[in-house]
């Protein structure tokens, strides 16, 4: 059986093209496009990298390198909601360990794991750019300041 070439769905392709057209150089849209792909699929399908590289007029290994470099991109373990937890020094000093422990208590998983129902994955990241609100975490694109396990449980219940 012949393998067909991967194609983006029209809706996604249109969004990617809008991002590409926004910038003077196509390559400048790479992060926005990767976020768009991840938001659409829940992760970055490996077969999507070649068509994206073609759209951006970049070598495939450049796009692969960007995906590998940034820990905000998931290449596997599809989860509907990625909980990115800042583990930089400021957040660490302000209580990241308490946040991670609360997530483990509520979800029953450790960082890097996906809940059995496929809804949540805990992903430690280096910086979310919100040091004044430390410790911070994001559920997909929504940013939150961690205050307590009760507050965290309330936030996560919005995503079920």
UniProtKB/Swiss-Prot annotation:
Q: Which reaction does it catalyse?
A: a quinone + NADH + 5 H(+)(in) = a quinol + NAD(+) + 4 H(+)(out)
Cofactor(s) named in the record: [2Fe-2S] cluster
The keyword Iron is assigned to this record:
yes
According to the record, how does the cofactor bind?
Answer: Binds 1 [2Fe-2S] cluster.
Presence of the UniProt keyword Translocase in the record? yes
Biological function: NDH-1 shuttles electrons from NADH, via FMN and iron-sulfur (Fe-S) centers, to quinones in the respiratory chain. Couples the redox reaction to proton translocation (for every two electrons transferred, four hydrogen ions are translocated across the cytoplasmic membrane), and thus conserves the redox energy in a proton gradient.
Q: What is this protein called?
A: NADH-quinone oxidoreductase subunit E
What is the scientific name of the source organism?
Answer: Aquifex aeolicus (strain VF5)
